[in-house]
Amino acid sequence: MWFKNLLVYRLTQDVPFDAEALETALATKPARACASQEVATYGFVAPFGKGEDAPLVHISQDFMLIAARKEERILPGSVVRDALKEKVDEIEAEQMRKVYKKERDQLKDEIIQAFLPRAFIRRSATFAAIAPKQGLILVNASSPKRAEDLLSTLREVIGSLPVRPLTVKVSPSATMTDWVKTQKAADNFFVLDECELRDTHEDGGIVRCKRQDLTGDEIQLHLSTGKVVTQLSLAWQDKLSFVLDDKLVVKRLKFEDLLQDQAEQDGGDEALGQLDASFTLMMLTFGEFLPELFEALGGEEIPQGI
């Protein structure tokens, strides 16, 4: 269990996360299949294992892992538009009258309801790790919307979840721009070979570089004309690599072979043991990595009143 993306949320108050109580709460909203006329469903699933006996909360040391699954019917907009146009044309031709917006919207709803039972179904899972001692919730997602779906559903079942996206004192873009300009990142961080540069003007240009020497004259020229770094590939120690963006989203996390080999040794022969070992090692690594990342970005910002 290695996260591929990371959105970090700060608990703004102490929350007494009790594994047994959390298990009971999550069980009140289990994931389920869409009914024939439902567009989507959302609920909690076991992060590891299958079947009714698989726990909805996986506990390892001081960490908890939960997972939510979304099931949605995929109805392409083009299919609905074509069917609606055909129906509107038919009515206007047969009844010799214009179909206006209110009726058009009603027809569209009827078409969607007729097509839903035949629509393809897509399932997606989102994992979140809770670290109560650190006051953090880490979501394996690059989309804030996807993370908020999980957090709002968690809030719904436990009653209260005082949490906010973690922010830092210095703009990540400003820090990353400085690292590329000076060709030196903070201690234990190393600039790799990929970045995105944007003009600060609203309609300004975007330059995306991959497998390129970011210390070269071409990159420095872009920076000298006012572009700033909005995404940057980095490595931390010899343990992981990732892409950081200007919204503090960590993407394309890759844990180096050394960590994966250690987890494989720790986990034994069973699949569940392997998953547990990798999750534990990942969380312990995050326990070192995240404080260093936030410090490198100017330190965590604590809003007034919190």
From Swiss-Prot:
GO terms for cellular component: bacterial nucleoid; cytoplasm. One of its GO terms (biological process) is DNA recombination. It holds the Pfam family RdgC. Belongs to the RdgC family. PANTHER family: RECOMBINATION-ASSOCIATED PROTEIN RDGC (PTHR38103:SF1). May be involved in recombination. This is Recombination-associated protein RdgC.
